[in-house]
């Protein structure tokens, strides 16, 4: 299905047709289409991993397309790099803002392009601030160009990013989750500025998962799924349910099984009233022995933040944690490990795995003391034998336990981290995106391993952005949105549509 193009005498401001992008072993985009009109807000939607960011990075010159064509004002263009995109008037505002806190607002806007004095040596500070003030006047924004960016709120910093894009005379603005860290008043101010930009003919690509916002701001919506174009429809003519159905599709190419009933098992972990700023807001849940509790939600929902807080990696403002019925104080990962809690990070190569060390030392990383004799000597044989035992138990494919971890596949690296926590006798395990970056065969092995750990009585929280994976593995599913738990689903009742409904709303619900 091609993009919906209402008859219009002018060609689209931007038109991407048949876009394909391949990375080693992965077809990231396949025959994708997207167009943007002048003075339009066009929403781009899809699950995490649908290909939205890749498509927009091609438009912004970060990636190069392998197939397809890009036209601007009806003429074919090549966007070789971000500078070429800027020259064409295409600006992108990432969710992670790209500003320097120690520089002023004006310096951030014109960095590398500062106006110079008579001899072209020194920056003309007066002209710099005057040019920045002119952009803010256009935006109807009261902001002192001399203020250090580090002193601004996130909302104001976002306005600086918009001003920076406008300083390039941008006709196209790509906004990636622009309201993720904003409150309602700040969102209203952002929408006012978007309205002004639209009135001046700027086309805006708006990437968001927040349905209520899209109703307010978007003219059309394009949906992507699994790197493919699904449909483009006028926002006024579609429903939230229809958009969700397009996002998740109807085919679940995943093996399902009936989860065991763990409702009578002992509670291993109970969390009450956990809060940390806007990232975690009054989160509570229970986790039973032998249970896999799935944490679902969209990017920025707060799932990883909850796991890190329970593990003691980040401080909290409030909350109570009970392990096997006893209230515990967890102020650091060492405290969590002492209470039998392990955490497998979504970024295993930077947190959890020492890629420069060999397999055996990675497995023993959190338990090295048990291999030290007389407080001084390392029992190398005991270390090797223990590591070999876990290699056999978890079917870790490695030539030997002295093989450097960096030379193993992603799935085998993940098994090493699991072995580390099993050796440490952790009976409560947080798995954050456990199958990210590993192939289908390795995923199946990780699934079987998680099932086996649960059958052995381990209590598991599994955070995943892949809905089929959440449905395949979980005994219960907790859904989060904007730092809150918005609902809980029993495995037997859960569907992708129900999860997406909860992941895009802001009030708690229990669906059955």
Swiss-Prot record:
Residues annotated to bind ATP? 46-53
GO: which molecular function terms?
A: ABC-type D-ribose transporter activity; ATP binding; ATP hydrolysis activity
**A Gene Ontology term for the protein's cellular component:** plasma membrane
The EC number on file is: 7.5.2.11, 7.5.2.7
Q: Where in the cell is it found?
A: Cell inner membrane
* Reaction(s) the record says it catalyses: D-ribose(out) + ATP + H2O = D-ribose(in) + ADP + phosphate + H(+); D-galactose(out) + ATP + H2O = D-galactose(in) + ADP + phosphate + H(+)
Query: Which keywords annotate this record?
Result: ATP-binding, Cell inner membrane, Cell membrane, Membrane, Nucleotide-binding, Repeat, Sugar transport, Translocase, Transport
Q: Which Pfam families match?
A: ABC_tran (PF00005)
Write down the membrane topology: Peripheral membrane protein
Q: Start and end of every ABC transporter domain? A: 14-251, 262-507
Highest taxon of source: Bacteria
What are the coiled-coil residue ranges?
none
User: Which family does the record assign?
Assistant: Belongs to the ABC transporter superfamily. Carbohydrate importer 2 (CUT2) (TC 3.A.1.2) family.
Instruction: Please explain the role this protein plays, according to its UniProt record.
Output: Part of an ABC transporter complex involved in carbohydrate import. Could be involved in ribose, galactose and/or methyl galactoside import. Responsible for energy coupling to the transport system.
Protein's UniProt name: Putative ribose/galactose/methyl galactoside import ATP-binding protein 1
Organism the protein comes from: Burkholderia lata (strain ATCC 17760 / DSM 23089 / LMG 22485 / NCIMB 9086 / R18194 / 383)
């Amino acid at each position: 299905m091609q993009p919906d193009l209402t008859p219009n005498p002018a060609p689209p401001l931007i038109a991407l047709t048949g876009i394909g992008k391949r990375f080693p072993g992965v077809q990231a985009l396949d025959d994708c289409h997207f167009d943007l009109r002048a003075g339009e807000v066009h929403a781009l939607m899809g699950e995490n991993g649908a290909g939205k960011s890749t498509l927009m990075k091609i438009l912004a010159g970060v990636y190069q397309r392998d197939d397809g064509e890009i036209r601007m004002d009806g003429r074919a263009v090549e966007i070789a790099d971000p500078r070429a995109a800027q020259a064409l008037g295409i600006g992108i505002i990432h969710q992670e803002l790209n500003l320097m806190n120690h520089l002023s607002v004006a310096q951030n806007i014109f960095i590398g392009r500062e106006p110079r004095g008579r001899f072209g040596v020194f920056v003309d500070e007066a002209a710099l601030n005057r040019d920045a003030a002119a952009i803010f006047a256009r935006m109807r924004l009261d902001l002192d160009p001399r203020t250090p960016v580090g002193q601004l709120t996130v909302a104001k910093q976002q306005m600086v990013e918009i001003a920076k894009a406008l300083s390039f005379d941008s006709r196209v603005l790509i906004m990636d989750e622009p309201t993720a860290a904003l409150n309602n008043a700040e969102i209203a101010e952002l929408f006012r500025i978007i309205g002004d930009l639209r009135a001046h003919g700027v086309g805006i690509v708006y990437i968001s998962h927040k349905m209520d916002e899209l109703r307010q701001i978007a003219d059309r919506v394009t949906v992507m799924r699994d790197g493919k174009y699904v449909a483009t429809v006028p926002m006024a003519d579609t429903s939230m349910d229809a958009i969700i159905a397009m996002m998740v599709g109807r085919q679940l190419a995943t093996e399902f099984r009936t989860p065991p009933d763990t409702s009578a098992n002992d509670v291993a972990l109970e969390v009450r009233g956990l809060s940390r700023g806007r990232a975690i807001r009054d989160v509570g849940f229970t986790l039973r022995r032998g249970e896999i509790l799935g944490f679902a939600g969209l990017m920025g929902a707060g799932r990883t933040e909850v796991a890190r807080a329970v593990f003691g990696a980040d401080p909290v403002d409030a909350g109570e944690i009970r392990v096997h019925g006893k209230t515990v104080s967890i102020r650091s990962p060492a405290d969590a490990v002492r209470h039998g809690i392990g955490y497998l990070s979504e970024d295993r190569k930077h947190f959890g795995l020492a890629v420069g060390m060999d397999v055996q030392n990675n497995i023993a990383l959190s338990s090295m003391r048990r291999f030290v004799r007389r407080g001084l000597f390392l029992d190398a044989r005991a270390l090797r034998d223990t590591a070999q035992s876990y290699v056999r138990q978890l079917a870790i494919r490695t030539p030997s336990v002295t093989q450097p971890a960096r030379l193993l596949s992603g799935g085998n690296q993940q098994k090493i981290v699991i072995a580390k926590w099993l050796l440490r006798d952790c009976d409560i395990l947080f798995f954050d995106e456990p199958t990210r970056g590993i192939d289908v065969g390795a995923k199946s092995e990780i699934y079987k391993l998680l099932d086996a750990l649960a059958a052995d009585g381990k209590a598991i929280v599994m955070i995943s952005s892949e809905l089929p994976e959440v449905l395949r593995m979980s005994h219960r599913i907790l859904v989060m949105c904007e730092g809150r738990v918005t609902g809980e689903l029993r495995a037997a009742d859960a569907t992708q549509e129900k999860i997406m409904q909860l992941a895009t709303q802001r009030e708690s619900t229990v669906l059955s």
